[in-house]
Amino acid sequence: MSDSPVLPRAHGAAVLTAAMRSVAEDFQVDELPAFDASGEGEHLLLTVRKRGQNTAYVAKRLAQWAGIAEMGIGYAGLKDRHAVTTQRFSVHLPKRIAPDLSALDDDDMQVVEHTWHNRKLQRGALHGNRFVLTLREVVGDQAVIDARLHAIAARGIPNWFGEQRFGRDGGNVAAALAMFGHTRQPDGTLAPAPKRRLRNDQRSLLLSAARSALFNQVLTARVEQGNWDAPLDGEAWMLDGSRSVFGPEPWSEVLAERLARFDIHPSGPLWGAGELRCSADAAAIEQAALSDPQSLALRTGLEAAGLKQERRALRLRPQGLAHAWLDAQTLQLTFALPPGCYATAVLWELGEVVDAARVAPQSRSEG
């Protein structure tokens, strides 16, 4: 198991090379809210459009503006610094008296909407994200690229966790191993080491990285076998747009029809204590994919940390996928994804896209 494994492509070999995020405007993300504001309560709900500022920075800025602790700021998800993004924040103001909103507006940040709500905005409380991505310096046959995009829209893609989950050069996986009391030797084997004690936020980040790495490893096996979007005996099914899981159950025409219309998807493990939800052939693939020493160490560490077995869909279908050639070497993509899904998974099925924002060391930011 490598910290930064090369993922297989489900739709075949790369059909382009390109550059992404040469400027922030090339990567635009708008949150799709999960609810309408109540219009009452003591949490000021702000919709903020920002450029070159990540979520944590804006949260700190809002806390300073409101004169409250950062724990009084809520947001649904993290947005990257190297982008133009729109997202909601909640600001806890018990007296319902807000400072001057115009003080927040500058060239790189604007409050585009504000209202009141009766509770703090919780993590994950969004319907999804809409992306407008501009790829520049595109090299590839336009007709072949168009065909690949149509295939992605029709069939979907593997639901990879993106490289943002794993830190620079995949270092979060090695850090998770260290947290669990292991160190990797030069020959790749693991040796015992003192467990690292970390802040809760750091611990949570590394637990997520460990889980994500194991999931990607199972998905790699399914893609390589050509059954990432096909039923296996013992499959645990995930309902589209939810965390609900059912099965295993005998294959039927009803399941076939639901799979074909993307109502259900095969699922893979988010590792933790407890029995795998799947069985038979599906479980055999998962156990085989996670039988190497590093995977076993991550599995044991996640179980000891108190996480429970959960599932994640193996298949992802970008919603409303559309594209336009702005010129012979510039391709613009528009699509929406559910929470927790990565635009880079879409780009990977097209080819090698160099992220200009992550090439230089000083460009590191939260994802």
Swiss-Prot record:
One of its GO terms (biological process) is tRNA pseudouridine synthesis. Belongs to the pseudouridine synthase TruD family. The active site is at D80. It comes from the Bacteria. Its EC number is 5.4.99.27. It holds the Pfam family TruD. Residues 156-316 form the TRUD domain. Keywords: Isomerase, tRNA processing. This is tRNA pseudouridine synthase D. Disulfide bonds: none annotated. GO terms for molecular function: pseudouridine synthase activity; RNA binding; tRNA pseudouridine(13) synthase activity. It comes from Xanthomonas campestris pv. campestris (strain ATCC 33913 / DSM 3586 / NCPPB 528 / LMG 568 / P 25). It catalyses: uridine(13) in tRNA = pseudouridine(13) in tRNA. GO terms for cellular component: cytosol. Responsible for synthesis of pseudouridine from uracil-13 in transfer RNAs.
